[in-house]
From Swiss-Prot:
GO terms for molecular function: ATP binding; proton-transporting ATP synthase activity, rotational mechanism. This is ATP synthase gamma chain. It is found in: Cell inner membrane. It is a peripheral membrane protein. One of its GO terms (cellular component) is plasma membrane. It comes from Coxiella burnetii (strain RSA 493 / Nine Mile phase I). InterPro entries: ATP_synth_F1_ATPase_gsu, ATP_synth_F1_gsu, ATP_synth_F1_gsu_CS. Produces ATP from ADP in the presence of a proton gradient across the membrane. The gamma chain is believed to be important in regulating ATPase activity and the flow of protons through the CF(0) complex. Belongs to the ATPase gamma chain family.
C-alpha cells in the first residue's frame, strides 16, 4: 500500500497547486479588465494629438521639423522594447523577442547599428544576454503605470535622435487583439509621417493665438511619442494579463486531468493491494486446514 500512499500524496500536492493557479487566473482576469479600460481611455488622446500634429505641420510646411523628415543615410536605429516584469504569461515575451530580432536582423544585414531602451525586466534580461546595446531600462512599473513613469526612457531615445546618434526609432510591443490573441509587432515612431488625408479633408474648429505653432508642434511631437509609448505599455499590460489568465486556466485544467489520472492509478493500486491481501488470507487459511 506504500505506492497508494505516494499517489495520494501527489494528488494532495497537485490539488494545492491547482488552487494557486485558479486564484492566479481570477486575479489576472480582474486585472485584465482594468487594463482594457485604461487602454480604451488612452486611445482617443493619441488619436486626437496625431490629427492636431498633421494640421499644425501642414500649416507650416516651410518649417520641416526633424521629427517629420526622413533621413537619407541611416547609420544607426533605436528600438524601444516593451516587455513584462513577470513571467507565467505563456509565450507573450518569447514571441515578441522573435519578432523584434527578426526585424533587427534586417538592419544587421546592412551593417547598421542599434541602440535599445527596454521596458520590463524580462526584456532587460534577454537583450543583455543577447548582446544588445541597452541604453536605458524602465521596470517595476506595476499594473497601472503613469505617463511620468516612461518619460525618462523616451527622453533618452529622443536625445539620441536629436544628436543624430540614431536616424530612426522603432517600438516593439504586443498588440491586444482579443483575450485569446496577442500580436507582437514592430512599428516606426520616428520619423513620423503626417496624416495627409486628415489634413486635406478634415474640419478644424480651432485657431492658434498667438501664432506660435512652431513651438506648439515641437511640444506636440514629444507628447505624441510619449503617448505612443505609454499606449504600448498599457496595451502590453492588457496582453500580459490576458496571456496569464489563459495560461493559468490551462494549468488549472491540466492539473484536474492529472488528478483524474492519478486517482485512476490510485484506485488500481488500492484494488491490487486489497486483492493481494485477500489472496494472502485465503492462502493462509488453506494452509491451516
Amino acid at each position: 500500500m506504500s505506492k497508494a500512499r505516494e499517489i495520494r500524496t501527489k494528488i494532495a500536492s497537485i490539488k494545492n497547486t491547482q488552487k494557486i493557479t485558479r486564484a492566479m487566473e481570477l486575479v489576472a482576469a480582474s486585472k485584465m479588465r482594468k487594463a482594457q479600460d485604461r487602454m480604451a481611455m488612452s486611445r482617443p488622446y493619441a488619436s486626437k494629438i496625431r490629427k492636431v500634429i498633421s494640421h499644425v505641420a501642414a500649416s507650416h510646411a516651410e518649417y520641416p521639423h526633424p521629427y517629420l523628415q526622413q533621413r537619407e543615410n541611416i547609420k544607426r536605429v533605436g528600438y524601444i522594447i516593451v516587455t513584462t516584469d513577470r513571467g507565467l504569461c505563456g509565450g507573450l515575451n518569447v514571441n515578441l523577442f522573435r519578432t523584434a530580432i527578426a526585424d533587427m536582423k534586417k538592419w544587421q544585414a546592412d551593417n547598421i547599428g542599434m541602440d535599445l531602451c527596454v521596458i520590463g525586466r524580462k526584456g532587460e534580461a534577454f537583450f543583455r544576454r543577447y548582446g544588445g546595446n541597452v541604453l536605458a531600462v524602465a521596470d517595476h512599473l506595476g499594473d497601472a503605470p503613469e505617463v511620468q513613469d516612461i518619460i525618462g526612457i523616451v527622453k533618452v531615445m529622443l536625445d539620441q535622435y536629436d544628436k543624430q546618434q540614431i536616424d530612426a526609432i522603432y517600438i516593439a510591443t504586443n498588440e491586444f487583439v482579443n483575450t485569446m490573441v496577442q500580436k507582437p509587432l514592430v512599428r516606426q515612431l520616428l520619423p513620423l509621417k503626417t496624416d495627409e488625408e486628415e489634413v486635406e479633408g478634415g474640419y478644424w474648429d480651432y485657431i492658434y493665438e498667438p501664432d506660435e505653432s512652431k513651438d506648439l508642434l515641437e511640444m506636440l511631437l514629444v507628447r505624441y511619442i510619449e503617448s505612443q509609448v505609454y499606449q504600448a505599455v498599457i496595451e502590453n499590460i492588457a496582453c500580459e494579463q490576458s496571456a496569464r489568465m489563459v495560461a493559468m486556466k490551462n494549468a488549472t485544467e491540466n492539473a484536474g486531468q492529472l488528478i483524474d489520472e492519478l486517482r485512476l492509478i490510485y484506485n488500481k493500486a488500492r484494488q491490487a493491494g486489497i486483492t493481494r491481501e485477500i489472496a494472502e488470507i485465503v492462502a493462509g487459511a488453506a494452509a491451516v486446514e
